[in-house]
Amino acid sequence: MAEKKIRVFYRAAGHVPLWKVMEEGGFLEKHGVKVELGSREDLREKALEELRAGELDIISGNHHNLYAPCALRGEPFVYLAQTNNVWKENWLVARDGISGIRDLKGKRVAMDDFHSHTGLNVWLYLRLHGLEEGRDVELVNGEKKGLDRARKVMAGEHDATFVRVVERLRAQAIGANVIEVSSMPMIEGVTITTTTTYVNRHEDEVRRLLLALVDAIHFFKTRRRDTLDILNRSCRDVLKFQSAEEEAVFYDNEVASLERKPYPSMKAIQNVFALAARENPEMQAFNPLVLWDLHYIREIDDAGYIDRLYAQSQTG
């Protein structure tokens, strides 16, 4: 069987481990797929333009900025699978005297950019907890790296920020006040994003890639040591781990949120669409499900493929 070369570009470094498991676990080869993996970190609009022009085939990500072009201009973007439905930047770094979300009223909260996915997540999270921007809390753009924002909190320049689990370790190491808060449903992580134009011309490759994705998720969730070996070998530089502990907590955090069956949850779609609608309020009435075509995953699921993988793990 001839290998297919699919041009895949990830939008965040945290996506790389699952793609590397697909590759180094042998699942791309197993299903007759070849992937050219590249980065479009911090290049949300460039990735969109390249996908639109057919200069790349699949984006891993671009979670909220495709609703507007689809809703307002009828562009053929589509999401085919979703690996994570949980917001994971749920570690609050706060000044002394702040012990939870309720204490952020009247305070100054910093994130990297409140038009980015990370910043918009915090806007929505605070809103869901009764804190409206402007009325109850001030949202300010801050440093890109969570640890740098944590330092600014400790210096009194901000009252609080939110970080992910690895940055939580680093913030605690420098003496920051770090509090775990509840999460919320959210479309994050590896999302298989493409266009209906590409899918219609490459259905076989799409099916094979999704089979490789399902296999990689199963491997990731059930073979901890082997997955950590792949992370250590192939992802340390891109993820910039500074210790084995950081690598381990990253892995455990990923495993806890990876979906065995890569469907989005309704609440996660609702929440990510709220981010898109904040940026483009004229599309409030648009149905976000228009962008989701899950029938390829459903085919794999209905065939019993995923259930057999996990049944074999339990009996093996």
Label the model's feature ranges.
Residues 46-48, 146-152, 167-168, 250, ...:
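Short, hydrophobic alpha-helical packing/hinge segments within bilobed ligand-binding/sensory domains
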Residues 202-285:
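Secondary-structure end/capping motifs
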Residues 273, 277-316:
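Conserved C-terminal helix/tail region of periplasmic/extracytoplasmic solute-binding proteins
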Residues 2-141, 159-165, 179-186:
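Short, glycine-/small- and polar/acidic-enriched structural segments
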Residues 20, 67-68, 123, 169-172, ...:
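Predominant activation on well-ordered alpha-helical scaffold segments within soluble catalytic domains
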Residues 97-100, 127, 196, 200, ...:
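Proline/Glycine/Serine-rich low-complexity intrinsically disordered segments
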Residues 148-239:
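Pocket-lining segment of extracytoplasmic ligand-binding domains
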Residues 36, 44, 138-140, 245-254, ...:
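Short linear loop/turn motifs
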